[in-house]
Amino acid sequence: MTPAAVLSAASGVALVLLSLALLLTVLRIIRGPTLPDRVLGLDMLVAIAIGLIAVIAVRTGFYLYIDIAIALGLVGFLATVAFARFILARGLSPERRTPGTTEIPQAKPRPSQAGRRKRKGAR
Amino acid sequence: MALQIIAYVVALIMVVGACFSLLAAVGLVRFPDLYTRMHAASKAGTVGSGLLLFAAGLHSLDAAVFVRALAGFVFFVLTAPISAHLLAKAAHQAGYRMSKRSVIDQLPHKEEARRH
């Protein structure tokens, strides 16, 4: 096999693997039970996109793509930092926190019935 | 001959980097909670895309392009832990709990810290 053929085959394999990784990450973003999971998925998506851009740069020979990858990395970092600040400012999402109490439910997806009854009693 | 060796090395690094990215994505889907998923995403994911950038720089056989690819790699290695740490700290402070299978959580939550 010539080196060019090996490179072509390797970049094809890498593109297939990266596409699979992209699909799995999108699955996590759709399923992600909480907002930080989705933010993490977006961060991972940016990382995979950078890898994809690098493989396409090897495949086509346009090395200008590497600059685009660097710019994308910068944007992804800033987006993740902004989302982290937003999560910090927002706290738990409204449906996870039992209204009227300061207690945070211990790994319960929905507010418990007892909490709701307590709130009605308080009124 | 040297060119052939470089081509083979680039092909190998590219496949290995793509494998790292795929494993990071599998970890992102399979791990039980946010904090364990963060391990997969910020370690394996960074190595995967960093290796791919390195392969692209090596393939160009051009010093300017190689340095730019290396700069991108270094930038990514520097920023990925910062963003992961910030996200984990924000999620922990906001009150997102670990999975029930985790053993220890040494960082006190906001309410517990206030009580002490």
From Swiss-Prot, chain A:
Where in or outside the cell it occurs: the entry states: Cell membrane
Report membrane topology: Multi-pass membrane protein
Chain spans, region Disordered: 95-123
Recorded coiled-coil stretches: none
- Spell out the InterPro entries in the cross-references: MrpF/PhaF-like
Entry keyword set: Cell membrane, Membrane, Transmembrane, Transmembrane helix, Transport
**GO molecular function terms attached to this record:** sodium:proton antiporter activity
GO CC terms, sorted: plasma membrane
Q: Which residues cross the membrane?
A: 4-24, 38-58, 64-84
Q: Does the keyword Metal-binding apply?
A: no
Q: Sorted alphabetically, which Pfam families does this protein's record hold? A: MrpF_PhaF
What's this protein's family per the entry?
Belongs to the CPA3 antiporters (TC 2.A.63) subunit F family.
Return the protein name: PhaF2 protein
Species source reads Rhizobium meliloti (strain 1021)
From Swiss-Prot, chain B:
- Entry superkingdom: Bacteria
One GO molecular function term of this record is: sodium:proton antiporter activity
Annotated signal sequence range: none
Cited InterPro entries: PhaG_MnhG_YufB (IPR005133)
Q: Which Pfam families does the entry mention?
A: PhaG_MnhG_YufB (PF03334)
Q: Which family does it belong to?
A: Belongs to the UPF0091 family.
> Which NCBIfam families does the UniProt record give?
CPA3_mnhG_phaG, PRK12674.1-2
By what name is this protein known?
UPF0091 protein R00998
